[in-house]
């Protein structure tokens, strides 16, 4: 066999055994652990196939029908399908599906609608916002005069009066609504009214709840915001990537120019193929059933935890995620994250509003139901998971460094549970 023939015929196992080994171990991890990281999900085999397709070979700078390279006929077909499907999904007039991530989508909006030094107003990271919404370590916090709003100390709900006060005082060019750890619905109409009162543009980052919105279980921000950004994974259950929506043609032109050539070069066409497949899946009736299960499972998990004496930030959830305050249990986020992983449950440590712990420690964890719901878990399974989490909590209270016997027993139950709901 010639070198050329082997290049195209050898499998990954034949060509790169160490990488193949790592991938197999990661597959086994995903198969045998309960994934409760709220920003993660499990894609369909169809999405995997699209993302692993020959489109990974293709450069396609520009947009459908206006490329800077030849040979883009089929790339155009794929991107056009992705655009049409996401517009239909969210009832939007214009869409850009090229951003490589949600952060890139947010950056493109800022490049299009603001200039360095402008004032932007977003939710603080401490209150549940995202790095890209003006946090000091991020570009948005370095290039802009970033003002941050938070939550009410008593209710832990977004303090809309504070949002309005800050907007009136600082006159931002851009107001950002969205979060990475907030379990309640957002009042997009109120955000828009505040933005209009000071002449600001409103950007909604719906990354976490895009699937919930697509299923019609949350108000659609496209009806209120000047521009909407999102990731394609999380509750949308697609590949890792981003997109931008708007109903304003002039803003759409600015967004397109900001994404390319302003922020990115060639789009990742194999990822856009995966996005198109995921958008198509989300347009099917069964996706609404899936989201209904995600929401029901989150409520069920929350009720079990509350019954076990766990404090939930805001007292519960309206979406797919729960923010757990560990202080009443005398536990830390890092400690719990590690113990749960040893027990076969993956989550992430997370700061809670007004947290006094370092971000590397935290006083909370964030839990989400999308991934485990994808593999078929229902209310009964999430109630079982809730009870197992409580067992780990109580064992940690007695043994702060971890109770290996409890963790091993819980791990055995988790393995049996996952074995009933296989993936891939």
UniProtKB/Swiss-Prot annotation:
Domain of life: Bacteria
Main location, first listed in the record: cytoplasm
InterPro entries: PyrdxlP-dep_Trfase, PyrdxlP-dep_Trfase_major, PyrdxlP-dep_Trfase_small, Ser_HO-MeTrfase, Ser_HO-MeTrfase-like, Ser_HO-MeTrfase_PLP_BS, SHMT-like_dom
Keyword flag DNA damage: no
Residues with the N6-(pyridoxal phosphate)lysine modification: 234
CDD domains reported for this sequence: SHMT
Keyword hit for Methyltransferase: no
Name this polypeptide is given: Serine hydroxymethyltransferase 2
Record organism: Ralstonia nicotianae (strain ATCC BAA-1114 / GMI1000) (Ralstonia solanacearum)
